[in-house]
């Protein structure tokens, strides 16, 4: 017997980082008791939520462009005698709440990343056409206390937020102003959520935080992220653990040791450095040097020789000279990355870097980004190609585009394509890699090659 259709339809569009993906999932959880079922069609939605990112100017402007399109859908539904509520959530909502309401009056409510547990009440206020329609409080403990441990089924992998906010105050970054200071969830609450996920068939969790390795939500010895990883590794059925995003200053010896000692912790580390020039790192207020970053990488590789390293880079930071950029390229060559994210510096209002002299011309930023990305893509292709001939344990997640094909993830987070029966979804299966491209691996089940 099929389940009844949901009484109301919810469309969520997510911009930005994995934490926003997690937040969007939890918003759907919060709204499910009100009768909202998720739809992929915004034109059919009774409630549209745009979960926004404020890291770069382009991402912010995308939100306003999207709101113009959603407004037209709202007007079309009104003409048909149907309603639509528009909500803007996330970091743009936190930073520009009043501006959003001014620029786009069709928006019914604005909710910051620490207040989305208030969505049911905000929606009720919007429907009553009275009361405050903007919630942007910094109270992450209240948010998580209000969220149920149980979550909707997510598949065989899931994100799990363990830490929010940032105290580092990099001069280019808006996170301390949109997400607040560093705050860690209690380990008991995280474990309860992880156990509930495992009971629903989740085999892999990625622990999320703006500075996830600053986690300190447990009491006593082993209170940091390493202790949390060891605790979660004991959960039956939870076979893989990852974490992101980390700061070099918080990569302590205990966490590095966990990479050697905890088999469930995958051999993959995303450790942003942003630049290879100490002069630029000082201007960014990163509080580490290129050399200290390289020392951390060396220690991690001693602990786990096969670990895949990922990172973030910003080119064209104010005052960046050619020599500074060359230092970044040299650091990339020394590390040898498996994958990376790289961006042109984006001037964000209210951040110290926005007022710095020496703003770099757009064409210079673009030229440097192309040079950096060419080197990073070369390294990524080399890392993937080096997997050919190896047998890797692959967690199959979903069907592929071709008949009989499944897509999974290697321990190094690469997408792996192989022909396999659907019954293997959710299973960790040995796959012999036949080839590695820039973005994925292709292989065959090891049983077929035996």
UniProtKB/Swiss-Prot annotation:
Claim: Isomerase is one of the keywords in the record: no
InterPro entries for the chain: Elp3/MiaA/NifB-like_rSAM, Methylthiotransferase, Methylthiotransferase_CS, Methylthiotransferase_N, Methylthiotransferase_N_sf, MiaB_methiolase, rSAM, rSAM_horseshoe
CDD domains: Radical_SAM (cd01335)
Protein name: tRNA-2-methylthio-N(6)-dimethylallyladenosine synthase
SMART domains attached to this UniProt entry: Elp3
Cofactors demanded by this protein: [4Fe-4S] cluster
Catalyzed chemical reaction(s): N(6)-dimethylallyladenosine(37) in tRNA + (sulfur carrier)-SH + AH2 + 2 S-adenosyl-L-methionine = 2-methylsulfanyl-N(6)-dimethylallyladenosine(37) in tRNA + (sulfur carrier)-H + 5'-deoxyadenosine + L-methionine + A + S-adenosyl-L-homocysteine + 2 H(+)
Pfam families: Radical_SAM, TRAM, UPF0004
Highest taxon, organism lineage: Bacteria
Keyword field: 4Fe-4S, Cytoplasm, Iron, Iron-sulfur, Metal-binding, S-adenosyl-L-methionine, Transferase, tRNA processing
Sequence positions that bind [4Fe-4S] cluster 1: 17, 53, 91
Binding site for [4Fe-4S] cluster 2: 166, 170, 173
Cleaved signal peptide residues: none
Entries under Gene3D superfamilies matching the protein: Methylthiotransferase, N-terminal domain (3.40.50.12160), tm_1862 like domain (3.80.30.20)
């Amino acid at each position: 017997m099929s389940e009844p259709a949901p009484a109301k339809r919810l469309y969520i569009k997510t911009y930005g980082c994995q934490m926003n993906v997690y937040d969007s999932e939890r918003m759907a959880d919060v709204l499910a008791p009100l009768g909202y079922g998720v739809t992929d069609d915004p034109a059919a939605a009774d409630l549209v939520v745009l979960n926004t990112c404020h890291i770069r100017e382009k991402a912010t402007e995308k939100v306003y462009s999207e709101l113009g399109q959603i407004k037209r859908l709202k007007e079309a539904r009104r003409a048909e005698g149907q309603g639509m509520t528009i909500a803007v959530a996330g970091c743009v909502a936190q930073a520009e709440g009043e501006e959003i309401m001014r620029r786009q009056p069709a928006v019914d409510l604005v909710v910051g990343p620490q207040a989305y547990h208030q969505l049911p009440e905000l929606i009720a206020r919007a429907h009553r056409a009275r009361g405050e329609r903007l919630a942007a409080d910094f109270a992450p403990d209240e948010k998580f206390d209000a969220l149920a441990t149980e979550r909707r089924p997510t598949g065989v992998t899931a994100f799990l937020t363990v830490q929010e906010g940032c105290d580092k105050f990099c001069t280019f970054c808006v996170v301390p102003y949109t997400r607040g200071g560093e705050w860690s969830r209690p380990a008991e609450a995280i474990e309860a959520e992880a156990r509930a996920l495992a009971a629903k068939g989740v085999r892999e969790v990625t622990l999320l935080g703006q500075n996830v390795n600053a986690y300190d939500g447990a009491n006593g010895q082993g209170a940091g992220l390493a202790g949390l990883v060891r605790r979660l590794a004991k959960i039956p059925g939870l076979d893989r653990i990852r974490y992101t995003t980390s700061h070099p200053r918080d990569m302590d010896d205990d966490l590095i040791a966990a990479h050697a000692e905890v088999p469930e912790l995958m051999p993959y580390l995303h450790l942003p450095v942003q630049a290879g020039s100490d002069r630029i790192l000082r201007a960014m207020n990163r509080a580490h040097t290129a050399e200290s970053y390289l020392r951390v990488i060396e220690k991690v590789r001693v602990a786990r020789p096969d670990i895949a390293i990922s990172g973030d880079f910003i080119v064209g930071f104010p005052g960046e000279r050619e020599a500074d950029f060359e230092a970044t390229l040299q650091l990339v060559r020394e590390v040898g990355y498996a994958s990376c994210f790289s961006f042109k510096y984006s001037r964000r209002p209210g951040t110290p870097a926005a007022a710095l002299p020496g703003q770099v011309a757009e064409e210079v930023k673009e030229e440097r980004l192309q040079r950096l990305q060419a080197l990073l893509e070369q390294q990524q292709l080399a890392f993937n190609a080096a997997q050919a001939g190896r047998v890797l344990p692959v967690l199959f997640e979903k069907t592929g585009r071709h008949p009989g094909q499944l897509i999974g993830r290697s321990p190094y987070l690469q997408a792996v394509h192989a022909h396999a029966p659907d019954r293997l979804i959710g299973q960790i299966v040995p796959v012999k890699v036949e080839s590695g491209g820039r973005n994925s691996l292709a292989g065959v089940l090891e049983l077929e090659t035996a």
